[in-house]
């Protein structure tokens, strides 16, 4: 099973709590995180894109770096780990993304790929005057389908004459082209999103579900497998989890309860409000899960809380789910979390038994 790190491009990572570590996103922090992840044989690093935060006492995600420029920098200071940036497709023409991706392919030596997102948080785009109207909620995957067709033209042949409802290319050129086939990933959880991933993505991200229920996402992975069978493609699921680990189950649980007790209710209210704006995409979208009050303090990603041995066992359970090809991990404290993962958790995982046991990286 592949292991990736979801780097904290926004302040405070993925914990919406006054009791969680409070920090600003910087290149130096993310450089340290990704280099440490590479040392411990993580397979990939991904950054999201966020253009407006949730506010509240913690100013959650009010402070964000930009994904492509961050990952270009990280590509230059790593050598093995795969690097993925996220394109907010309403903000960037596909021909520009094609050229930026080809550039980072050159920087990384063929280790780069692109995560495509349609955009769900209306204020991110409204503040710039580029929100296309609420009809977009029901047409966003039509838009993304044309977008990726332009990308594939340009990466594959260096030229596009695509004509569609959203994009018109007139002998559009991009050169140099990527040195290897460019990976495209997506995070579709709705039926429309999964249909898109089945047709165009190399793999699909989905949320884990619940606390210490590592296989609860299995129905989502099964839906992705079924969608891919319709297109005759192999599109695996990569599952998002937060790891909160300590020497004992009780110590880890105490940390989790402490974070929940400090939940930033004002920021969470903003998230709930935004999740209700899309009335056209159905009830199975990512943002609906993010805003569920059950565990909104970490946007309801699957959460693995326990001793190092318990977390290793649960991750092996994740690997046993049909269609699950990898996990994307976040941590309550990224630097110490990756270190303890690499030294105390990964060596206990059967699905990572092929890797050497490593000790702390020497600076």
Swiss-Prot record:
GO terms for biological process: alkanesulfonate catabolic process; nitrogen utilization; uracil catabolic process. Pfam families: Bac_luciferase. InterPro entries: Luciferase-like_dom, Luciferase-like_sf, Pyrimidine_monooxygenase_RutA, SsuD_RutA_monooxygenase. Keywords: Flavoprotein, FMN, Monooxygenase, NADP, Oxidoreductase. It catalyses: uracil + FMNH2 + NADH + O2 = (Z)-3-ureidoacrylate + FMN + NAD(+) + H2O + H(+); thymine + FMNH2 + NADH + O2 = (Z)-2-methylureidoacrylate + FMN + NAD(+) + H2O + H(+). CDD domains: Alkanesulfonate_monoxygenase. One of its GO terms (molecular function) is alkanesulfonate monooxygenase activity. FMN binds at residues 49-50, 115, 124, 140-141, 190. SUPFAM superfamilies: Bacterial luciferase-like. Gene3D superfamilies: Luciferase-like domain. It is an enzyme of class 1 (oxidoreductase). Its EC number is 1.14.99.46. Induction: Up-regulated by the nitrogen regulatory protein C (NtrC also called GlnG) and repressed by RutR. PANTHER family: ALKANESULFONATE MONOOXYGENASE, ALKANESULFONATE MONOOXYGENASE-RELATED. Belongs to the NtaA/SnaA/DszA monooxygenase family. RutA subfamily. The FMN-N(5)-oxide reacts spontaneously with NADH to produce FMN. Requires the flavin reductase RutF to regenerate FMN in vivo. HAMAP family: RutA (MF_01699). This is Pyrimidine monooxygenase RutA.
